[in-house]
Design a protein with these regions (language model features):
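Metal-dependent amide/peptide-bond hydrolase catalytic core
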Residues: 2-231
């Protein structure tokens, strides 16, 4: 892992006119918020390819014999199996609604309603994320930053990288080390503030039929013991 998306968790709040649920109300905060959240969830973000992402897909194309089109890398996603679930998210910014909060009783129209959005931006595209969210929701819904962290991207080169690559091929001669951009984040963000260049290195060898990415924060989150044993050797 030679790059990471940045993080912007934000709370959206809509205000309206509180009232009885049995009456007409054209200033329903929950209705306004729901419409904004739906627009965010369905928004089709433009493709943005960073240096690390291009490097990854060039190597995928070389390994599979498939054509490489630097203007559209999405066709190559089918060549990387379940990993495409995460890698696909590194071709663009993302913003996923994750939490909703409004009201306290079935027959009361709330005066306010809020939602939490998990925004992730590519290196160099934080402003695109923020400005797009603002344009989607309009001026009547407020945005509050819950948490924000930087994006990272470093060169996939140097003695440390060579050591990682040689360790993998020593225990798996058919293994092809490639860089990738992580859709989440690690402590490397904090280390970068100290001038320390860090890489993610998790040498797990996983069964071909395991959709490993689907297990992240999912039901029965786990990792095969054989994969860990391989990683310890590496």
């Amino acid at each position: 892992e030679a790059a990471q998306k940045g993080i912007h968790w934000m709370r959206l709040t809509a205000k309206g006119r509180a009232g009885h649920g049995s009456m007409m109300n054209d200033e329903n905060a929950l209705t306004a918020l729901s419409e904004a959240v739906a627009k965010i969830g369905r928004y089709n973000w433009p493709q943005r390819y960073t240096k690390v992402v291009k490097d990854l897909f060039k190597r995928v194309a070389q390994a599979t014999g498939r054509p490489y089109d630097e203007n559209d890398l999405r066709p190559l996603l089918r060549e990387i199996g379940p990993t495409a679930r995460m890698i696909g998210a590194t071709l663009q910014n993302t913003a996923n609604p994750t939490m909703l909060e409004a009201g306290y009783k079935a027959n009361v129209i709330p005066g306010t309603a809020s939602a939490v959005i998990d925004g992730r931006f590519l290196p160099g595209y934080e402003e695109e994320l923020n400005s797009t969210i603002k344009s989607i929701i309009g001026p009547d819904i407020s945005i509050e930053t819950i948490s924000r962290d930087i994006a990272l991207e470093v060169d996939f080169a140097g003695d440390l990288v060579e050591s990682m690559c040689s360790a993998i091929t020593e225990f798996d001669p058919e293994g092809i080390p490639v860089p990738y951009l992580m859709s989440g984040g690690t402590d490397n963000k904090a280390l970068s503030d100290l001038g320390i260049i860090g890489y993610g290195f998790s040498p797990l060898r996983l069964p071909e039929d395991l959709d490993f990415m689907a297990l992240f924060h999912g039901v029965d989150e786990r990792v095969p013991i054989e994969g860990l044993e391989f990683g310890v050797k590496v």
